[in-house]
Amino acid sequence: MKVTGLFFMLVFLVVGSLTASLSLALEPHEILVLANRNAAKSVGLAKYYMERRGIPERNLVQLWVTDKEWCEREDYEKRVAAPVREYLKEKDSNREIRCILVLYGFPLKVAPPGMTESEKEEANRLQKRQDALKARIGQLKSGDSQEAKEAEAELEGVRKQISSLKKEDQAASLDSEISLVLMENFRLSGWIPNPFFAGYKAKDMARDRDKVLIVSRLDGPTEATVKRVIDESMETEKTGLTGKAYFDARWPRPSEEKNNKKDVGYGFYDRSIHRAAELVKKSGRLPVVVNDRQELFQPGECPDAALYCGWYSLAKYVDAFQWRPGSVGYHIASSECQTLKQKESQVWCKRMLEEGIAATMGPVGEPYVQAFPVPEMFFEFLLDGSWTLAESYALSQPFWSWQMVLIGDPLYRPFKR
């Protein structure tokens, strides 16, 4: 997983002070449900969820788009974004809708815009140069030679040019794009700062909040998985989530006097995993187990798992967990929501859902580490009990128009007050 130079100067805010950013307790009538008429079971699951949660029938929008796990940018704009935008403008003039729920059967990923003919020609030329450079580097005896270093430097430059021509940084999760459906002309390259993110200090971002929707998805390998998630989430709310909280850091937590406020990338997130564990422990809600070894939790080491956050096993789920009904967790790695349907895939989101988790999140493509929800923030909001799953995600997730997907009942409150 890649790291950039961006770092977060977190503002540690009490939950009550954030009511201006995002109203407490998302309500059923504030959710717009999207179902895909081209996907078997999608409409049926949408109606099942809406009936169980008491969402008005008028809040269902039935669309027709591919049921594959990715779609072309043009199809997304024409078949998803445009009709949703039209609905919101014509039938939600009072702006009651705060959340979009994407149902089983929608693509996970929106491809970048296609290349022009001249861009294709240039990409083909660069591809040939890339192949020639790879062959040349392979012929050189020593990677330490000046000639090899120069070839490798040129190869890196060619790769970046190809990536730019293919507009690879304009691909995104469908869910992250649809959050900005009311912002018709936003920049596609890279990410857009999330104005709900509680870690940003910039007050001028508040003006964008009325143009942004929070988004969740009810999806999984099968229809039965989705129904289980719905049913378990609602049942768990009646008694509260029980079990243990597991946190899998890579390094021991440094002493407080060594804490670096400008900690970046991996170090920042590893420290945040430790802080999340401490928050859960102080709450007294669940017993906490922290692993700070280089080795991840191993098979069978995590019985009664209710909460989880850890890293790093790329696209290779470790069967360490016995998931409790209503459990919530995520694994910080680059590929963990690239598919929910490929049978042999071992990506974490798919496998956790298959094994019994009720809510998770992950990227559909390389996100960079700082695109993940900040662990200590996400779990603090979730533990509070006033915030729903979707709100906890929105408040702790730094970017929209990027790679992340939240899977779970948006109204779920595992520690409901």
What are these regions (language model features)?
Residues L88-E122, F247-K343:
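Catalytic-core segments of thiol-dependent peptidases
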Residues A25-W70, E74:
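N-terminal mature-domain "stem" immediately C-terminal to a signal peptide or N-terminal signal-anchor/transmembrane
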Residues L32-L34, N59-L63, C99-V102, A245-D248, ...:
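Structural recognition of the beta-strand scaffold that forms the well-ordered cores
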